[in-house]
């Protein structure tokens, strides 16, 4: 079991009940990856199926969304293969805003 904090910033909170910070307990047996977390987010936290495409494209985080693992770009940490540790902070920030 892993407890993580997930942040939805840059307007992404709009598809997550207007709540920017969520504490998530992943009950899956170790190891739990960021990919597992993303699957959990999509299957349990996005209420409107039409909103999935705002967050996911081609089975990954949509381009234009910066993903950080403990303030480090997820590309440097192995992206979806990163193994979550208790207390990790995962941030998703949309860079695509209305003007």
UniProtKB/Swiss-Prot annotation:
Any one GO cellular component localisation term in the record: cytoplasm
Annotated crosslink Glycyl lysine isopeptide (Gly-Lys) (interchain with K-? in acceptor proteins) location: 99
Pfam families: Urm1
Record key words, sorted: Cytoplasm, Isopeptide bond, Nucleus, tRNA processing, Ubl conjugation pathway
Name this polypeptide is given: Ubiquitin-related modifier 1
Family: Belongs to the URM1 family.
Database matches in SUPFAM superfamilies: MoaD/ThiS
PANTHER family membership: RURM1 PROTEIN
Matching InterPro entries: Beta-grasp_dom_sf (IPR012675), Mopterin_synth/thiamin_S_b (IPR016155), Urm1 (IPR015221)
Subunit structure: Homodimer; homodimerization may provide an autoprotection to the highly active C-terminal residue before attacking its substrates. Interacts with NCS2 and NCS6. Forms a conjugate with the target protein AHP1.
Biological processes, Gene Ontology terms: cell budding; cellular response to oxidative stress; invasive growth in response to glucose limitation; protein urmylation; tRNA thio-modification; tRNA wobble position uridine thiolation; tRNA wobble uridine modification
Top-level lineage group: Eukaryota
